[in-house]
Amino acid sequence: MVAGCVVALLATAAGPAQALDNLPPKQPLVQDLRTENSPCATGDDPTYVSQPPRLSAVLYDPEEDNQPVEANLVKGEFEAWWTDGAGVEQRRTHTTLVSLSGTPRYWTVPDDIPANTVVSWHVRADDDEATSSWSDEGDGSACSFVYDDVSPEKPTISSPEYPEPEDVFWVDGVGVYGHFTMDSPSEDVVSYRYEFPGSPPRTAPVEQPGGPATISYLPLTSGPKWLRVRAVDRSGRWSAESEYEFNVQSGRAPVARWRLDDPAGSRSATAETGTAARAGTGVTFGGPAPSGTGATATVGLDGSGHGFLTTDAPATDIRKSFAVSGWARPAETGRNMTVASQDADGGPGFALGLRNGETGPAWSFAIGDATVSGGAPETGEWAHLLGLYDAETGRARLYVNGHEVGTEVAATPAEAAGAFQIGRARGAVGYRDRWHGDIGDVRVHDRVVVPDEVTELARRKPKLLGRWALENATDGTSPEQSGGAPLRLGAGASIHRGSDDSCIPELDPDCPYVPPALVGNGHLALDGETGYAAADGPVVDTTESFTLGVVVRLTDSALDRPMTVLSQAGEHTDVFKVRYDPSTHSWQLVMPEKDEAGAPEKVVAQIKSAEGGQKRRLAVVQDDGTDTITLFLDGSVKATASLPRGLRSTGALQIGRAGAGGGWGEYFHGDVDEVQAYSGALRERDVPFLGTGVDYCPC
């Protein structure tokens, strides 16, 4: 019995002896130490800080010595030291609270640390039973910082291209780069924080501490401008702000421009600026101009060796920034053709035109060995082309109909001091890639043409085709406001007139209430069964850009079927229709894939909208330049679809019904007002003015 007790006692005593003794925390690693947000600085390059910094260290305690469910806790012991002005070493210490192993510990050093003095620090871990080695022992290193309590001085700002107004009041100009040098007298400045109007703040580094920094700026608009700058020193301190003002003129005119609107029979093209261009015998003056551009005529080139115009002199130095642009309408797209180029040795210095690749024809701008391509040329269709080389960035871009296409590329132009060409490009022997088609208004700028200018150059101003205010009707027709063709009203259509204000229902119980018109004094009321209005023929050319606007209100309390408000047919089916579909609670733009009997319809754009008798303003904008069609609701909400080429419409514009099975259907039950039609695509900013009851000019 006694022996058994002894054995049990010995077994109990042996349990704790098998547990591991406490292991000391691990030595902190330099890569786990930070001064503020900067890594530990070792050696002779301390971190500069603008205030007494917060130091941090991630500390670890081994887990091998843990008891079951024991938390692995550790605290940090920080120590900082420096030599004061009397040569005496000063030290400050701090012990943190305990925290879990692997988490950072912090110490914000006291405010009595001296400025402009190297302060060193190290740290060790403590688990209340043992401490680690200091972080600078063995292979470790001490960290160091310098507290900088003085901000840098304000910088001066200068620019050779854009002097201040007291020197030159207005300076040329939009599309011309300016270079601004910022320089602070402080020797520890490492960067400059700067801001131009309309742009976010940016940082420009210096090449060496205390040096200047030069930035470039491309004005995109004219008017008064400013540059605000602060110097930033190595501690992160900012100087007071310096402001530099300058005034930017509008972009200067082209260095060369040929309107190409000379009279038929001319043998040369007059230059508005630059050198006149002599024409080959394959050039015909007096051709048609793209509508809505202000151009009155163009030239036709027959694609032969005689179809060209040349100045016999360069138009610009293509080693500097330049842009070349013009209107072009190809008579074919199956081969390479050049709109404009400038001769270099054995080839063109640049070439703007049409190129054929594996995916088919595309517009192209080539300069040196670089080419950017995009867009889809179509036979017989006008396009505005602009090729741009930006010497500041060394990049080339291509714009088609005011929109950038393709991907900009790095380009290195060769010297091209040869003649400027319209309709051909230099080859190894003679000329090649001759243009077959029409060309108009060719321009060459010796600067960057900025995006807003590109858009304006390519803009084709819409033309009002008709506005039907639907205020009244005589003999079943409602007039167009400018005396154009009226709309014919069907049996279930009538003009509702709002109150004439001859009496006031709120004051006179015998005065009947008359609902107000949607817009103005009247609107078209449709019964949803036979009611409609129609023009005598197609109002918009659906193969070109167009805009339609209308104001509507659904009055059917039980919407159980689609209802069409606008449609225009081809030979066999509606080329487009705008309708409300209650099953999807959306306004829809519907188009067929083909103009064939029974062709399936496709909803190309739709906008969700729960309808409860509200007035709605709808618009359809087809932009042939971008191959898109857009449905707008209330001037702002939109849905856009790609439309490579619209089907041709031959049927009359219908208000309130759509074609169905050889007859009519989808009759609209509600009110319609302010039908407006334009040739050309209204800009998005113009669409909200549709349906307001005024003759809007998208000028």
Locations of regions flagged by a protein language model:
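Flexible glycan-contacting loops in extracellular carbohydrate-active proteins
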Residues: 357-361, 408-438, 641-672
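Short, conserved beta-strand segments of beta-strand-rich sandwich/propeller modules, principally
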Residues: 118-122, 224-228, 323, 384, ...
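Low-complexity, disordered linker/stalk regions enriched in Pro/Thr/Ser/Gly
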Residues: 8-13, 17-256, 286-312, 323
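Extracytoplasmic low-complexity segments
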Residues: 61-68, 85, 211-219, 224-226, ...
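Short, aromatic/His-centered strand-loop micro-motif at the edge of beta-sheets
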Residues: 362-384, 589-617, 662
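Localized edge beta-strand/strand-to-loop motifs within extracellular or lumenal beta-rich domains
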Residues: 381-395, 614-628
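Extracellular glycan-recognition modules
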Residues: 252-255, 305-362, 395, 448-454, ...
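Extracellular beta-strand elements of beta-rich domains used
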Residues: 326, 385, 439-444, 450, ...
